[in-house]
Amino acid sequence: MPEEIATLAGGCFWCTEAAFKLLRGVLEVVPGYAGGHVPHPTYEEVCTGTTGHREAVQVRFDPGVLPYADLLRYFFAVHDPTSEDRQGPDVGPQYSPAIFYHSEEQKRVAEAVMRELAPLYPKPIATKLLPFTTFYPAEAYHRDYFARHPEAPYCRLVIAPKLEKARKAFKSLLRP
């Protein structure tokens, strides 16, 4: 089965990147900026909230090992899908959650997973389902941020607890 790409915005890309690196079947995770109207934005530009980009990750995965539907179920567990412009302590349109679909099949699967999970939340799902347009990889200093800075306050207080929750809830999807 050929590899696939998923582009997902779930708040801070340091968190999302670290979370997806735990999964078997994931071949690569690249943090960056999805959507938007400014070509090749910088982190500083995206942080102004005026470029239209979301912090996101591109996940290259083997759907024979990790089906897209399971990847999306995991995605919904590692971000707050009911919050429009906030994920934990991070506030602004650049943290707005979204699934950027790369094909009609990805769109169909995402719609089905969203319908399946909607009753589990006390509020409507705010995560947007959008066609993929652009993705710009983040600057090198953002890549593998959690792995390189596990003792940084944000990593200890925000990312580590999120990863622990994911490890407990999704043992069957994790790398050995």
Curated annotation (Swiss-Prot):
- Enzyme class, top EC level, equals oxidoreductase
| Reaction(s) catalysed by this chain's protein | L-methionyl-[protein] + [thioredoxin]-disulfide + H2O = L-methionyl-(S)-S-oxide-[protein] + [thioredoxin]-dithiol; [thioredoxin]-disulfide + L-methionine + H2O = L-methionine (S)-S-oxide + [thioredoxin]-dithiol
Keyword Calcium attached: no
Q: Pfam families, from UniProt? A: PMSR (PF01625)
Q: Does the keyword Cell division apply?
A: no
Q: What is its EC number?
A: 1.8.4.11
For this protein, the record's SUPFAM superfamilies field holds: Peptide methionine sulfoxide reductase
Q: Which residues form the signal peptide?
A: none
Q: Which domain of life is it from?
A: Bacteria
What Gene Ontology terms describe what this protein does at the molecular function level?
A: L-methionine:thioredoxin-disulfide S-oxidoreductase activity; peptide-methionine (S)-S-oxide reductase activity
Which GO terms fall under biological process for this protein?
protein modification process
Active site (UniProt): 12
Protein keywords: Oxidoreductase, Plasmid
This chain's function reads:
Has an important function as a repair enzyme for proteins that have been inactivated by oxidation. Catalyzes the reversible oxidation-reduction of methionine sulfoxide in proteins to methionine.
The entry's family comment says: Belongs to the MsrA Met sulfoxide reductase family.
Question: Could you identify this protein by its name?
Answer: Peptide methionine sulfoxide reductase MsrA
Please state the gene responsible for encoding this protein: msrA
